[in-house]
Amino acid sequence: LQLVFDNSLIGVAIDRFGKEIPVLKESETQFRTFVEISVSKQFYGWLAGIGKGVSIVEPKEEQEKYRKYLENIWKL
């Protein structure tokens, strides 16, 4: 899974995924990382808690699943 985070969330990413995650500069304000995880509703909830500070970049299928998850919450 490829994720892009705001730079201010580096500690959050390390707390969640560990110190060994790759951290690549995406822009002046963001970094990209690659993680191997089992995606679940709990993971989506964690992402939603961070808000706009993180986004799923790849795979596109997972990005779409997360978007649908958020839409379903919005409909509640």
Language model features: what each stretch is:
Residues 1-76:
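Polybasic (Lys/Arg-rich)
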